[in-house]
Amino acid sequence: MWLRCLALALTLLMVSGIENNTKDVCVGNPGIPGTPGSHGLPGRDGRDGVKGDPGPPGPLGPPGGMPGHPGPNGMTGAPGVAGERGEKGEPGERGPPGLPASLDEELQTTLHDLRHQILQTMGVLSLHESLLVVGRKVFSSNAQSINFNDIQELCAGAGGQIAAPMSPEENEAVASIVKKYNTYAYLGLVESPDSGDFQYMDGAPVNYTNWYPGEPRGRGKEQCVEMYTDGQWNNKNCLQYRLAICEF
């Protein structure tokens, strides 16, 4: 026992560098632990830790209350592609008969006003002698001098045809236009390629003539008819420039 104490003392002396005043130190065995002390006071709260990651979503909750009211209508969408045409339906029932035209007051009023306007227009144009009314015919000229074929196209484009007098009254009306412009005019008659006689443009035979004495002559060469300023007729080739007079 004393040897152990001596070794410890020498070691302590060498470490501390102290040569004298050494003390004998002896370490004993650990004693029996004492009884635990009473619990101390609670410590203070620590600092807040770092925010953790979000947790997983919770389970689906139960349905809510009653559905809300429908929202307002949205904007109209673009029209879709047209579908195929359906089958033709059955004819509908026949409607009740309408009133006779003579009893339709509105129609009669419209016709009366239209007739009045037409007569007014004709009257105004007649003052300029560019339009003359004889019976159910209307003769008109635009003062142009062109060949026979061009006159045909001009009159047809206006809805009429080359003037062709069929009575002394009609011939006098056409002659008054010829006198006004002081130039000859072609009439709506042509020589038949078969008989050589003159006929109307639709092929019907002529029922009225006012030939200049000794006319017509030059069969086969002069296949059109012109009117002099005195209203008499003469056959002529169709390539001359003559006053265009149309009838409607």
Swiss-Prot record:
Glycans are attached at N20, N207. Keywords: Calcium, Collagen, Disulfide bond, Extracellular matrix, Gaseous exchange, Glycoprotein, Hydroxylation, Lectin, Metal-binding, Repeat, Secreted, Signal, Surface film. Residues 42-51, 84-93 have a biased composition (Basic and acidic residues). It comes from the Eukaryota. GO terms for cellular component: collagen trimer; extracellular space; multivesicular body. GO terms for biological process: respiratory gaseous exchange by respiratory system. PROSITE patterns: C_TYPE_LECTIN_1 (PS00615), C_TYPE_LECTIN_2 (PS50041). Residues 28-100 form the Collagen-like domain. Residues 1-17 form the signal peptide. It is found in: Secreted; Secreted, Extracellular space, Extracellular matrix; Secreted, Extracellular space, Surface film. Belongs to the SFTPA family. In presence of calcium ions, it binds to surfactant phospholipids and contributes to lower the surface tension at the air-liquid interface in the alveoli of the mammalian lung and is essential for normal respiration. Enhances the expression of MYO18A/SP-R210 on alveolar macrophages. Oligomeric complex of 6 set of homotrimers. This is Pulmonary surfactant-associated protein A. The lineage of its organism: Eukaryota, Metazoa, Chordata, Craniata, Vertebrata.
